[in-house]
UniProtKB/Swiss-Prot annotation:
NCBIfam families: mraY. It catalyses: UDP-N-acetyl-alpha-D-muramoyl-L-alanyl-gamma-D-glutamyl-meso-2,6-diaminopimeloyl-D-alanyl-D-alanine + di-trans,octa-cis-undecaprenyl phosphate = di-trans,octa-cis-undecaprenyl diphospho-N-acetyl-alpha-D-muramoyl-L-alanyl-D-glutamyl-meso-2,6-diaminopimeloyl-D-alanyl-D-alanine + UMP. It is an enzyme of class 2 (transferase). It comes from Cereibacter sphaeroides (strain ATCC 17023 / DSM 158 / JCM 6121 / CCUG 31486 / LMG 2827 / NBRC 12203 / NCIMB 8253 / ATH 2.4.1.) (Rhodobacter sphaeroides). The lineage of its organism: Bacteria, Pseudomonadati, Pseudomonadota, Alphaproteobacteria, Rhodobacterales. Its cofactor is Mg(2+). Belongs to the glycosyltransferase 4 family. MraY subfamily. The gene is mraY. It is found in: Cell inner membrane. This is Phospho-N-acetylmuramoyl-pentapeptide-transferase. One of its GO terms (cellular component) is plasma membrane.
Amino acid sequence: MLYLLTAFSDGGDIFNLFRYLTFRAGAAFFTALIFGFLFGRPLIDFLRRKQGKGQPIRDDGPTTHFAKAGTPTMGGLLILSALVVSTLLWARLDNPYVWIVLLVTVAFGLIGFADDYAKVKKQNTKGVPGRVRFLIGLLIAALAAIAAAWSHPPDLTLQLAMPFFKDALINLGWFFVPFAMVVIVGAANAVNLTDGLDGLAIMPVMIAGTTLGVIAYVVGNFNLTDYLGVHFVPGTGELLIFSSALVGGGLGFLWYNAPPAAVFMGDTGSLALGGALGAIAVCTKHEIVLAIVGGLFVTEALSVIIQVLYFKRTGRRVFLMAPIHHHFEKKGWAEPQIVIRFWIISLILALIGLSTLKLR
């Protein structure tokens, strides 16, 4: 929105700064961060008053989690509000990719909010039926995939870009739409499954968001794509604003979510942030790289799938408990130990993902 002030610039005043993507990205980061610091405590106090007993704790989970009873959930509202406000202030609102990612984020956030509300109201861990959440998510992802395909250049519309190869594209035809749907819905649910320990999900989300923001900037810059041999998608650089706001809002939330957490992000935050990562990957044509950068989320989701399928077939479990972070809890790992080690893994995977821009 503030980009419009460049119309009043004579080239030598402060308004001219708004032309620069990197300046607006930095401003978006600090806007979201300050928003989180300012409104975090009032929101937590409000949620605690409204929710009473807070988020229900699973009876079959690790016994250490019982001490978390009474902690309010829906803290994702803080991240979402900071993210949306900052993006609307600093991004170019005539950019279709900004709106695609922003609307996907808000839509998945609403699904998560409904689920969190149902859990708190009923005081159980069921919430909205999984099938309902899944179908609504598929609908949102389908609309986003079609909008992204419509916005992409004609030579990229239905293509899948392959990392590690210069200008390597595979024509998926209209299979691109269901593929993109799987990416967005899969990312949303994978982050949701990862959000089981204080601070566990938000840092890997910020690391992945930073990585995808850099990728969006590169992919949207013709000179950089020409040098690196990466496909050029005009306009995606503006997603750096969104990613910067995501990281700023995430840090503001982590201030209150650090162990012992004063608030949980809930499905409101995890579904929204996962959907956002998936949408950015689809818009930038880096869906496969997302699987690398978000490898921690993929592992968490696969651990649940493997556990369920193996148990149905044999009546036995592969892991002591799924998702896999609970397996390590059952093995006696301390919660901070699991969280920090998973953060380190996420950082390593992000560096590998970034290397795909050069290793071609």
